[in-house]
């Protein structure tokens, strides 16, 4: 007679709660370390700063706010945090989610109400991406509010992978080596923008947001109509990372390791003076091409 065996244990069962907690603690510690390092490296926060944390309801901005709150508890300098959200009047936007969450954690906050949705959908031709105009209008509204409230810094939730993707978008589509700096002054000179997640990977943010169970709000305006160029760059980067793990981190490090003399930007390095052995003025391009130019104009 065949023996009767108990059912086999599911070897793919979820990890034990203790192990999950340990992994989550390690992840939170890594993120705090990376955010703290970025703040220190780029001088993002100083004593008595009044920081406006831009909260969209996405994983990145939730993680940004959470990290800043954790770091502030033991920070070497005092600073204030206020969460600010722009209600763009998108149809179906759950207006209650952010205020309820922020109130539950005792976070000072303000909701700016401005109908940019109607403007963007009216102005942008059908079939075109809405991202560019939407971003400009959102930025304008946030900057205006920051100015009226006297905020000294504006914190955004862009992370390491965003910065790398922006670099390649500018390289591929605009023929320039520029990106998304961890800290910058706005074009009008009135605001200092900081990106404390500059060293944090998107993979870690996804894992952290999932562990913390943030009430994520999808963007109905552009979430389903992702910017095509950024999406294409994202596909390339993910393929590189899959084939060569650590590739994105290496690229991110390269953004802070520039060698102007080994590029070709004449405004950053004086190639004219390199190796000169006299003070005689150098002939310009017109002089060097005089023969060709003469031939071009010949009958």
From Swiss-Prot:
Cofactor note: Binds 1 [4Fe-4S] cluster per subunit. The cluster is chelated by three Cys residues, the fourth Fe has a free coordination site that may bind a sulfur atom transferred from the persulfide of IscS.
Catalyzed reactions: cytidine(32) in tRNA + S-sulfanyl-L-cysteinyl-[cysteine desulfurase] + AH2 + ATP = 2-thiocytidine(32) in tRNA + L-cysteinyl-[cysteine desulfurase] + A + AMP + diphosphate + H(+)
The EC number(s) this enzyme carries: 2.8.1.-
UniProt cross-references to InterPro entries, sorted A to Z: Rossmann-like_a/b/a_fold, TilS/TtcA_N, tRNA_Cyd_32_2_STrfase, tRNA_thiolation_TtcA_Ctu1
Transmembrane segments annotated in the record for this chain: none
Localisation per UniProt entry: Cytoplasm
Sorted UniProt keywords: 4Fe-4S, ATP-binding, Cytoplasm, Iron, Iron-sulfur, Magnesium, Metal-binding, Nucleotide-binding, RNA-binding, Transferase, tRNA processing, tRNA-binding
UniProt pathway annotation: tRNA modification
This protein's record includes keyword Transcription: no
Enzyme class, broadest EC rank: transferase
Signal sequence annotation: none
GO cellular component: cytoplasm
Main location per the UniProt record: cytoplasm
UniProt cofactor(s): Mg(2+); [4Fe-4S] cluster
Extra facts: The thiolation reaction likely consists of two steps: a first activation step by ATP to form an adenylated intermediate of the target base of tRNA, and a second nucleophilic substitution step of the sulfur (S) atom supplied by the hydrosulfide attached to the Fe-S cluster.
Protein name in UniProt: tRNA-cytidine(32) 2-sulfurtransferase
UniProt source species: Xylella fastidiosa (strain 9a5c)
Organism phylogeny: Bacteria, Pseudomonadati, Pseudomonadota, Gammaproteobacteria, Lysobacterales
